[in-house]
């Protein structure tokens, strides 16, 4: 009997095609803007779940001596991972492009995302003060070194990685900064007839560069 494995779609790749259709809803200009943003969020949440459950399971299977083949397509776990990786990169690039389109659409409607690379003096002062009073007290940064092993990172949480320069030894160490789910993810500022909004992780990144401890300072974040 002729081999018909090529006639069938792999379950993981088929799921990615489904999630691509969710993503394409974010680019449909016929939909309300907030609904398009919601589809973008759903796409990303779906992808998180996909990696936690499906891709994680495939990686576990690669550790077994006798890898089970996919019943339908007869692909090994390693072959499935190799097929998934470029497909996800393609979808993520498309998601990033749609995100920029939606930011432009938001700007047309007087909702402007704060660009921390181009702040005037007044804006810089405001956000630094906000970080110092509202965010810094609840940050719990961790250093990874010989005395402190790499910490457990929880699923669906945001972490920032920073490179720290040790002043006494000139060596570099890794720092992990958890962005607690207890923090507000976004911060809004009303100005005239516009509303500016900032992401917490971007504000933390900006502020960490200007923080220097007695023994170390942030050089890359």
Task: Please name every model-derived segment.
Residues 6-47:
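N-terminal-proximal low-complexity accessory segments that begin disordered
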Residues 11-15, 35, 43, 73-76, ...:
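Secondary-structure capping and boundary motifs in well-ordered enzyme cores
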Residues 27-30, 40-116, 193:
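Extended, charge-enriched "interface" segments that sit outside catalytic cores
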Residues 123-174:
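Extended, Lys/Arg-enriched charged tracts that mediate electrostatic binding to polyanionic substrates
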Residues 135, 194-195:
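Residues that scaffold, gate, or flank divalent-cation-dependent active/transport sites
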Residues 146-151, 155-157, 187, 193, ...:
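Divalent-cation
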């Amino acid at each position: 009997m002729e081999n018909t494995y090529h006639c069938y779609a792999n379950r993981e790749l088929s799921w990615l095609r489904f999630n691509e259709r969710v993503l394409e809803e974010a680019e449909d200009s016929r939909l309300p803007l907030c609904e398009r943003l919601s589809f973008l969020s759903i796409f990303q949440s779906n992808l998180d779940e996909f990696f936690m459950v499906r891709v994680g399971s495939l990686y576990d299977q690669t550790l077994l001596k006798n890898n089970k083949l996919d019943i339908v397509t007869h692909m090994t776990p390693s072959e499935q991972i190799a097929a998934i990786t470029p497909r996800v990169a393609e979808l993520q690039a498309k998601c990033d492009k749609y995100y920029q389109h939606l930011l432009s659409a938001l700007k047309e409607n007087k909702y402007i995302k704060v660009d921390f690379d181009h702040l005037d003096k007044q804006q810089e002062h405001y956000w630094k003060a906000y970080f110092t009073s509202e965010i810094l007290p609840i940050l719990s940064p961790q250093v990874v070194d010989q005395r402190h092993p790499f910490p457990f990172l929880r699923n669906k949480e945001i972490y920032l990685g920073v490179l720290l320069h040790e002043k006494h030894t000139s060596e570099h160490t890794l720092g992990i900064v958890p962005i607690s789910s207890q923090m507000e993810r976004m911060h809004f500022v009303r100005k005239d007839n516009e509303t500016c909004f900032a992401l917490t992780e971007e504000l933390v990144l900006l502020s960490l560069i200007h923080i220097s401890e007695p023994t170390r300072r942030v050089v890359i974040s």
